[in-house]
């Protein structure tokens, strides 16, 4: 397992180029059990970052529709979803080592066979590793909203990234986003409105009800208890 989660960029003179990311590499505590899970199970479930496209048949035992989840947090809901849909293959991307360790722990406990995870920046994974026209669904649940206006440049779900996703989805594939930030929800609607390939599956062209397939996370439960409203956005890729 590689410890770097971004690819450093340099100019022709060898000077490091500062990049804007949708995450901050916080020095959060990775527990002993999480580190142990990484050591034991990464070789079984983890996929190292590479600069060329993945061959999905080489990382999954069975051929099946592929669902990509970006930013799976602890991985508990991702693992449960993979258990609920054994006829699908799941690929998760996460930038925090604690989340990687936690997900590996859950997956190994339930002996999940249809899940693989990547420890790297999602933008670079999408650019380099995900072949075009291969994903049946992309799900991004509770991405960092970066509330302050000066931090909006860090938001993952900008127009350029949403366009990248259109290249990776199959026709009629689904993009499903959930957020507890109303301002971010409307920001996403604004960023995606000019991308003609996306069809909003909401009757009112805004939000949909939470589908039963999306498991309510601990983070979401906490927000609901605090009176927060959850916004589900769902789009289908059309020709």
Curated annotation (Swiss-Prot):
Binding site for substrate: 148, 180, 217-220
Record has Transferase as a keyword: yes
PROSITE patterns in alphabetical order: SAM_MT_TRMB
Gene3D superfamilies found in the cross-reference section: Vaccinia Virus protein VP39 (3.40.50.150)
EC nos: 2.1.1.33
UniProt catalytic activity: guanosine(46) in tRNA + S-adenosyl-L-methionine = N(7)-methylguanosine(46) in tRNA + S-adenosyl-L-homocysteine
Keyword tags: Methyltransferase, S-adenosyl-L-methionine, Transferase, tRNA processing
UniProt-recorded Gene Ontology molecular function terms: tRNA (guanine(46)-N7)-methyltransferase activity
Superkingdom of the organism of origin: Bacteria
Catalytic site: 144
Amino acids binding S-adenosyl-L-methionine: 69, 94, 121, 144
GO cellular component: tRNA methyltransferase complex
Pathway the protein contributes to: tRNA modification; N(7)-methylguanine-tRNA biosynthesis
InterPro entries the record matches: SAM-dependent_MTases_sf (IPR029063), tRNA_(Gua-N-7)_MeTrfase_Trmb (IPR003358), tRNA_methyltr_TrmB_bact (IPR055361)
Family the UniProt entry places it in: Belongs to the class I-like SAM-binding methyltransferase superfamily. TrmB family.
Subunit text: Monomer.
Functional note: Catalyzes the formation of N(7)-methylguanine at position 46 (m7G46) in tRNA.
Protein name per UniProt: tRNA (guanine-N(7)-)-methyltransferase
Species of provenance: Buchnera aphidicola subsp. Acyrthosiphon pisum (strain Tuc7)
């Amino acid at each position: 397992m590689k410890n770097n989660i971004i690819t450093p960029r340099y100019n022709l003179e060898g000077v490091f180029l500062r990049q804007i990311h949708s995450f901050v590499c916080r020095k959060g505590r990775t527990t002993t059990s999480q580190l142990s899970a990484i050591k034991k199970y990464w070789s079984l479930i983890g996929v190292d970052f590479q600069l060329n496209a993945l061959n999905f048949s080489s990382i999954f035992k069975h051929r099946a529709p592929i669902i990509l989840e970006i930013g799976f947090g602890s991985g508990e809901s991702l693992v449960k979803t993979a258990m609920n849909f054994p006829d699908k293959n799941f690929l998760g991307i996460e930038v925090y080592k604690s989340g990687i360790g936690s997900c590996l722990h859950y997956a190994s406990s339930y002996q999940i066979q249809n899940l693989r995870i990547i420890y790297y920046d999602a933008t670079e994974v999408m650019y380099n590793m995900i072949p075009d026209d291969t994903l049946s669904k992309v799900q991004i649940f509770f991405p960092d909203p970066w509330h302050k206006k000066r931090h909006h440049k860090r938001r993952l779900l900008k127009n350029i990234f949403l366009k990248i996703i259109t290249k990776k989805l199959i026709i009629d594939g689904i993009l499903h986003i959930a957020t507890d930030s109303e301002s971010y929800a409307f920001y996403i609607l604004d960023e995606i409105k000019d991308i003609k390939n996306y069809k909003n599956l909401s009757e009112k062209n805004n939000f949909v009800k939470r589908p039963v397939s999306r498991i309510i996370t601990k983070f979401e439960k906490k927000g609901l208890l605090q009176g927060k409203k959850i916004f589900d956005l769902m789009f289908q890729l059309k020709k």
